[in-house]
A protein has these predicted regions:
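Hydrophobic faces of well-ordered beta-strands that scaffold small-molecule active sites
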Residues: 38-44, 69-73, 110-114, 167-171, ...
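Active-site cleft segment of glycoside hydrolase catalytic domains centered on the general acid/base Glu
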Residues: 51-55, 81-95, 122-239, 244-264, ...
Length: 438
């Protein structure tokens, strides 16, 4: 879920050097293209106390119109087994049965993200446990279980009950968050690794076909993932899930490079990403992902199509199906009106290999200066290279602003004539470069 907004794309930033080798594309080439695109889908409302099974029907009907292959839903363990172990709440089960059943009938599979520790299992301090009430959200729910086996039993139950109707079971939500909202307490990597190992073993015993998704990471610097590798998690998951909201493609690439450096070939599941259509009425917590409704639609389509040629990305799941009172990440407004993003994502999931928006470039004279200006596809760093007399004289690394545009003044030392400029996105590489001369 969006929090601690990741490195925004609200300003264009340029870092210049004199010369360096050009970067190659970091997506897949056409020869590497998988037979089918990643499992495209959308996040939907999951299991929490009081949710109506009818909500499941409406969400799956919308997901089907999106051509979604998967939906991702949070499943709160504290709602599933609120009072004691192995005592599954009947109302909770009615919702999950309805969601999984409706999805299966529509040809859609479900990713369950299982988090939120029940009071009886929580490792929270006594001061928090005293105020922990079953079926109510409290700070104690964010603390991991005292015994990982209790969590493992719950996810094994889900694997046994739903089996092949699940796309996967994601082990917790965002344990590397710097806040204490989802995974509280000390020694996070150590405790998460213990939960993951117990969960993987139990799920595979219940149904070996059910995928186990580890990580649920928000950080792309690799620190938490390296800490997990040091605690022996390799071999205890089928996919590594990540949640990247800013510089989505660059973040996916960065975490994949950490995987490769550690001999990890499991695919990435980008099962939470998106943009909020809150501009210009910005909300503080959404500032760095805040765009217009039109840009939200464009970004989602471009991201899906950029990722579709990447064999090591198994899924791309947009956050979220519908706006809430606090967030505008949805494809559908809180009123029920479809936003432009709904149609854009539907077309992208139907035609995932269509080309993303191209890089554009114009060289403009502004007094005694030359300015490079244009636009590009969202998600990664951009590179500008300026040549004089066929020699590379200037390079700028930058990111697009919230409207996917850029303006880069060229250094005056380059002069104002016989300049050739090339701009490209790292992910797409030189094949997608825009060229201009002046």
């Amino acid at each position: 879920m969006p929090a601690s907004w990741r490195a925004g794309m609200t300003v264009a930033l340029a870092l210049a050097v004199c010369a360096a080798a050009p970067c190659r594309a970091h997506g897949a080439t056409s020869s590497q293209r998988p037979a089918t695109g990643p499992l495209g889908g959308v996040n939907v409302i999951g299991l929490y106390s009081g949710v109506s099974p009818a909500v499941a029907d409406r969400q799956i009907a919308a997901a089907r119109k999106l051509h979604a292959k998967v939906v991702r839903a949070e499943l709160r363990w504290s709602t599933l087994e609120p009072v004691r172990p192995n005592d599954v709440d009947a109302a909770a089960l009615a919702f999950t049965d309805r969601l999984v059943g409706a999805a299966a009938a529509a040809g859609i599979r479900v990713i369950f993200t299982v988090d939120s520790t029940p009071c009886w299992a929580s490792s929270a301090p006594a001061s928090l446990l005293r105020n922990c009430v079953p079926r109510k959200s409290t700070p104690a729910n964010a603390w991991p279980p005292t015994d990982p086996a209790s969590y493992a039993a719950a996810v094994a139950y889900l694997a046994h009950r739903y089996g092949a109707k699940l796309a996967g079971i994601e082990i917790w939500n965002e344990p590397d968050q710097s806040n204490q909202v989802y995974f509280a307490g000390p020694n996070k990597a150590q405790r998460y690794a213990a939960i993951l190992k117990a969960a993987y073993t139990s799920i595979k015993q219940a149904d070996p076909s059910v995928r186990v998704l580890a990580g649920s990471l928000v950080g792309s610097n690799g620190l938490f993932l390296r800490a997990l590798y040091a605690r022996g998690i390799k071999g205890y998951y089928d996919g590594l899930s990540v949640h990247f909201y800013s510089l989505t493609l660059a973040s996916v690439r960065a975490i994949h490079e950490v995987q490769l450096a550690n001999g990890d070939s499991r695919p990435l599941w980008l099962d939470e990403f998106g943009w909020s259509s809150c501009f210009p009425a910005q909300r503080i917590q959404e500032e760095q992902a805040c765009v217009t409704a039109r840009i939200q639609a464009q970004n989602l389509a471009d991201a899906i199509r950029s990722l579709s040629g990447t064999p090591w990305v198994a899924a791309a799941v947009v956050y979220h199906l519908q706006d809430t009172a606090h967030e505008n990440f949805g494809l559908i407004a809180a009123s029920g009106r479809r936003k432009p993003a709904f149609a854009a994502l539907s077309q992208a999931l139907l035609r995932p290999y269509a080309r993303p928006h191209r890089v554009t470039l114009a060289l403009l004279r502004r007094g005694a200066k030359i300015v490079a200006a244009g636009s590009g596809p969202v998600g990664d760093y951009m590179e500008l290279e300026a040549f004089v007399g066929g020699v590379l004289r200037y390079r700028a690394l930058f990111i697009l602003n919230r409207f996917n545009r850029y303006t880069i003044p060229l250094p005056r030392v380059l002069g104002t004539r016989a300049i050739q400029v090339r701009v490209y996105q790292y992910w797409a590489g030189l094949a997608g470069a825009a060229l201009a001369r002046i």
